[in-house]
Amino acid sequence: MPKQDRAIRTRRTILVAAASVFEEHGFQAATITDILNAAGVTKGALYFHFQSKEDLAYGVMAAQGRHMGVVPPRACKAQEVIDTVLLQTYRLQKDPMVRAGVRLAMDQHASELDRGTSFQDWGKGMTLLLDAAKEQGELLPHVVPSDTADLVVGAYAGVQSMSQAVSGYTDLNHRTSVLLRHIMPNVVQSSVLTTLDLAPERGAAIYAEIQALMEAEELAGASA
């Protein structure tokens, strides 16, 4: 295996292990020793890629942000807003990296970390989608895209936190669908609202769609 590929795999292994430890113990209680044991790598290998526990936490949060990804484009930009939320819901239930990133962002005891970046980045992405929706005439006249983006991100943070505490995310699909059904009628035109798909199971379908697109791109790249 080429040295660069091996380094990438090692870094990924360390991040996955760190995500597992942070998800289980939180930032303060997690230790480098716990992460080393979970990763099965040497201390030298870990410190080659990450200089500290804080550095590891930022790596997990950055990976979580990338895993949120960008949903496939839709003619209706309001649907893209919904798809972004539903995709995050699916990944929270299925991906330990996403769960760990969210736990770190919500961890009030992790005072050493800049926890606001995750929320701000998601809010910026939501604002761009809502700006596009406004340009297409999909939004009600009173809607300010940046304000609505902050509302969606903040409300979702609370809903997912409650779901994690109450059911370990098993009811997150339902809670997310309820949230969207209450928010969207106050955001989009009635003619747009009737076209939106808010089904809880849509997140899994979006994830499968993204995976299929990625596989097609890889095949195209391999045959080029």
Question: Model regions: which residues?
Answer:
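Basic, helix-initiating cap at the start of DNA-binding domains
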Residues: 1-25, 29-41, 51-58
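Key DNA-contact positions within bacterial/archaeal DNA-binding proteins
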Residues: 44
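Short, Lys/Arg-enriched C-terminal cap helix and immediately downstream tail that follows
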Residues: 58-59, 187
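Hydrophobic alpha-helical connector segments
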Residues: 59, 69-98, 149
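Conserved phosphoryl-transfer catalytic core
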Residues: 64-67
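C-terminal peripheral helix-coil segments that are non-catalytic and often amphipathic
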Residues: 79, 83, 91, 124, ...
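Short secondary-structure transition hinges
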Residues: 88-142
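All-alpha amphipathic helical-bundle segments outside canonical DNA-binding/catalytic cores
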Residues: 117-118, 135-151, 167-175
